[in-house]
């Protein structure tokens, strides 16, 4: 989509970060609407957009941006065998749209995701999701979500 520089290590500019914030929100929710700043906090962190830069309440995405996001979500769902029979909308509402708490620690951020009964399915996910490391953010994000219980 052209948001990143040629080395894929930084966003091209502030406008690209803002577009990425709204694209991430669309990716999670599957819809475009007006958002409060507080609903975009995690996306702001993931794009390294400084807090002093205001965000619009709404940003219209291009057809290409929406199609890319929809294909990405469908691809993730298709590569998780336990999601067979689950609609894309059901997948989004069950696993992507969650409440969470974000805390800044000395060396990283901690994202604690609200637990749901069906989170046991996370034990079957064929990729890692406990750490988010991006070249443009200084501190990685540690994800605390469905800690497997060992008895």
Question: Where do the language-model regions lie?
Answer:
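Short, compositionally biased pre-sequence/patch detector
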Residues: 1-151
């Amino acid at each position: 989509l052209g948001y990143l520089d040629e080395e894929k290590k930084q966003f091209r500019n502030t406008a690209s970060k803002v577009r990425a914030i709204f694209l991430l929100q669309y990716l999670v929710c599957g819809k475009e609407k007006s958002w409060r700043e507080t609903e975009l906090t995690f996306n702001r962190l993931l794009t390294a957009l400084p807090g002093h830069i205001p965000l619009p309440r709404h940003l219209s995405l291009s057809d290409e941006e929406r199609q890319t996001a929809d294909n990405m979500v469908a691809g993730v769902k298709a590569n998780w065998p336990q999601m067979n029979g689950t609609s894309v909308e059901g997948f989004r509402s069950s696993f992507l749209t969650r409440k969470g708490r974000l805390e800044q620690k000395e060396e990283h951020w901690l994202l604690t995701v609200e637990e749901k009964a069906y989170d046991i399915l996370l034990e079957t996910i064929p990729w890692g999701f406990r750490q988010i490391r991006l070249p443009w953010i200084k501190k990685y994000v540690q994800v605390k979500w469905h800690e497997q219980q060992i008895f």
